Amino acid sequence: MWGDSRPANRTGPFRGSQEERFAPGWNRDYPPPPLKSHAQERHSGNFPGRDSLPFDFQGHSGPPFANVEEHSFSYGARDGPHGDYRGGEGPGHDFRGGDFSSSDFQSRDSSQLDFRGRDIHSGDFRDREGPPMDYRGGDGTSMDYRGREAPHMNYRDRDAHAVDFRGRDAPPSDFRGRGTYDLDFRGRDGSHADFRGRDLSDLDFRAREQSRSDFRNRDVSDLDFRDKDGTQVDFRGRGSGTTDLDFRDRDTPHSDFRGRHRSRTDQDFRGREMGSCMEFKDREMPPVDPNILDYIQPSTQDREHSGMNVNRREESTHDHTIERPAFGIQKGEFEHSETREGETQGVAFEHESPADFQNSQSPVQDQDKSQLSGREEQSSDAGLFKEEGGLDFLGRQDTDYRSMEYRDVDHRLPGSQMFGYGQSKSFPEGKTARDAQRDLQDQDYRTGPSEEKPSRLIRLSGVPEDATKEEILNAFRTPDGMPVKNLQLKEYNTGYDYGYVCVEFSLLEDAIGCMEANQGTLMIQDKEVTLEYVSSLDFWYCKRCKANIGGHRSSCSFCKNPREVTEAKQELITYPQPQKTSIPAPLEKQPNQPLRPADKEPEPRKREEGQESRLGHQKREAERYLPPSRREGPTFRRDRERESWSGETRQDGESKTIMLKRIYRSTPPEVIVEVLEPYVRLTTANVRIIKNRTGPMGHTYGFIDLDSHAEALRVVKILQNLDPPFSIDGKMVAVNLATGKRRNDSGDHSDHMHYYQGKKYFRDRRGGGRNSDWSSDTNRQGQQSSSDCYIYDSATGYYYDPLAGTYYDPNTQQEVYVPQDPGLPEEEEIKEKKPTSQGKSSSKKEMSKRDGKEKKDRGVTRFQENASEGKAPAEDVFKKPLPPTVKKEESPPPPKVVNPLIGLLGEYGGDSDYEEEEEEEQTPPPQPRTAQPQKREEQTKKENEEDKLTDWNKLACLLCRRQFPNKEVLIKHQQLSDLHKQNLEIHRKIKQSEQELAYLERREREGKFKGRGNDRREKLQSFDSPERKRIKYSRETDSDRKLVDKEDIDTSSKGGCVQQATGWRKGTGLGYGHPGLASSEEAEGRMRGPSVGASGRTSKRQSNETYRDAVRRVMFARYKELD
């Protein structure tokens, strides 16, 4: 059949009824071919429809009689007469009337039964009158099963060794419901070869009274090992003496299947992959008299070593050099070894339950009150051998792989658990693998632990270190090849090997389907990755690193802190509860007074002892976990400085960037990548360097971008805890977590705040400069990063406790009450309303004034200044960011009639209507003043006008209609931008055009404007005109022109008349030599009236005007005419 290359006559699988199937000769037309060697017997499974004697593994249940040499029995495929129990021909022990020679136990040694090397005639065990082999206690004809030379019965080298016995319509005869002794342990309604949880009676092959072994037409079924309380029952259900084939209550453990190698081609009773068959090679068997056909009742020890098991009857259907499964094991549930040598001392049979082949009504899972089908029962029965492990089965080449069920046993695990769909517990606990899903097949979880429960979280062990997240997620595919959706990779960073990777599915069904489809393994980058379920409870959450840590880890894999300590510290950091207690004693406050430089050294320790209740910073929390011996000395101070650089306050947001401070300017990114290679895998694209260009006082910074905040924290902690300290190119580098705070926020100078507190406070008390102003203002705004110390307030001269809200006088060392000055807020508001951004000259003047006043007031405390002057100092502008300037409130102008043309003028001028209204306001002519006050007034007016062109709230230049990111850029734009200068000049011209138009209007009224001819002459002749500023080319001067008389004009032609009317003379002005014009008196006859311009006004655009100016002038003139 399947898998056999030899051509043979095949009858196909039997399709009749159960009774006809085992009729004594339904397939006797095909005698079994003789086997030439013992090796051929490995493939001689005699099944129905094969060339050899048809013998169905599932339809017989007689005692094993073949291949005793291999510690098992065979019913067919012998070189000589075959002991076929289904109708084989020739002499032998045939249970169905076949004339076959007796069963052979294949060349056993002295301690084994041998059914091969005998010369004795084997009786027919079914319908013959030959020597009986009585299994019911009768004294049958002596028949030696040990030293026979007759060929042994083997069913392995036959053509039908791959018959599928699963798809039959009707299972063979039953052990329970039939009165015949059949060898079919598969398709029955009852349980099968179940040797656990049952009261197994022994098989007694001696002291029987009947003379023949008829296993077919009996009133009582043959093998009933169940529901008997240890009573010894023969093959017909009769009680007898001590039993031979007892699988329970033995003192010595029997062979175990644990630690075997699974044969990949085992035959199955149902055409599936099976474990190896029972192997009795090298077993110790009791001596048997070769002259008798009955089993000698051995001692208990011998019986246990003999390995005589009910399963041996099933082994007879297989060869004995390759392992085969036991009764009912039709699902390939074991992993077996190729050989069994001396493993008869396996698990004791006390751990087993007996099997019932006849009258049992439920499978091994009696406690579940569920009756399984024949296949399920046999699969359950198979699990029983995990504990007993007494038998080997051989020959898995003839397996039918069409309907396999991947339930298997891993004997390497303790207890030899069986893997089912539901990841059931092992059978010693009384559970079945098919309780929940008993209809599902093809489940193979042989790579996972048996106790694990399915969960949505699957752990991948052995993932390549360089595997990306996309490669890992794409490795999970649906059956149609599509990537699995809604997959989440838990805490994985490319380039780091944590030993495992966890993938979370959105649905439990998806996770189970993944395990089923991949059978516990997955290929990622040509590397096999192991899959296993992981309970979510196995992970614990590190609040400090914000990462899930494996349950097997007692410390965080990122911050390296213990689980308990990390959680405790994080609770304090995340949820600080400062207690507003009373001010400590003066001696406790003394360290915070930077009166002497010597106070700086014990400051951390004393502060830590006296202000434990006001810890809000991580630096203080870290000190609490240090031993007292480490809280002293320069090492502790260096650690405090290093911790202060980290910037890990609870106010800081998560950051993925590490900052390296004080590196060399010449350090390239490659060096940083190389130095950090032992701790993190980087590329030069992850490193940025900001070089110091301010001289020796500045620092060069390096920034390293990582994948997550937890990873950045981990690297920062590692680098900060190095001893010796972390250095690059021989220079010690400060490492901290980069926070994205601006310089005017709480992060400003945060790296200097704690370590240099003493120095700053010392300068502050002396009244010193910008640092004191900055620090006091920062603390006054509540942005001081350290909340566990007193803050010097330069406005009062006292030290301020921001938590308690009290002031402390350093001189008296007592608390003082400072009343709030009611005048301060108003003056601060006035200062906020003062314009702080002026033009170029005003900005310089303001800066010079501030610098001068700062030098003058240095050395005097703010408290004294306020006491004497009663106003805020001028340096307050440096204490905080410059606020946006509010426009100076002016009294609203009186309402006036607004012409709609004003909007049009605003559009042309590029300004708003509001600004145009201000421009239209005509101030009265100023009274004559002295030069100096007039100059000062003009400058103030100029500054006010420029302020009107700037919106300090929106940081926008209204003149250029541009907005800027900050105030400094806006000021630079006003001072340096050419565009702003051009627009400002145009704006000034527009403002001046008012006076110019008024002057022109007066001239028009006085009749001083000339006509069109006068304009031409003025352009060509009047070189002294102030409006004439550019002449591209000069023509002849007035001295070159020859004034002609009226007589020269020829009036006879029309052209002459025209020339005469316009003032030209004949012969002049027509060529290049006489381009002159007639006198102005001759042009007075021109009609004056409305033209391009207003009546009596010239329409000429002035030479210094742009087109926009000209249009504005004309429109303004028309507006005046309307008034």
From Swiss-Prot:
**One Pfam family name from the record?**
OCRE
The biological processes this protein is annotated with in GO are: mRNA splicing, via spliceosome; RNA processing
Q: What is the effect of changing S353F?
A: In a non-small cell lung cancer cell line
Q: Can you list the GO cellular component terms from the UniProt entry?
A: nucleus
Q: Where is the composition biased (Acidic residues)?
A: 910-922
GO terms for MF: DNA binding; RNA binding
Which intervals hold domain RRM? 456-536
Question: According to the UniProt record, where is the region Disordered?
Answer: 1-391, 413-454, 574-654, 741-787, 827-948, 1004-1106
Kindly list the positions at which Phosphothreonine occurs in this protein.
T344
> Function, please?
Specifically binds poly(G) RNA homopolymers in vitro.
For the keyword Nucleus, the answer is: yes
Polar residues bias (residue ranges)? 356-365, 772-787
Pinpoint the Glycyl lysine isopeptide (Lys-Gly) (interchain with G-Cter in SUMO2) cross-link. 36, 331, 386, 453, 469, 569, 871, 879, 887, 935, 948, 991, 1019, 1042, 1046, 1066
Can you give the residue ranges of the G-patch domain?
1051-1097
Keywords, A to Z? Isopeptide bond, Nucleus, Phosphoprotein, RNA-binding, Ubl conjugation
Q: How does it assemble?
A: May interact with FAM168B.
What is the superkingdom listed in this entry's lineage?
A: Eukaryota
Q: Which species expresses this protein natively?
A: Homo sapiens (Human)
What is this protein identified as? RNA-binding protein 6
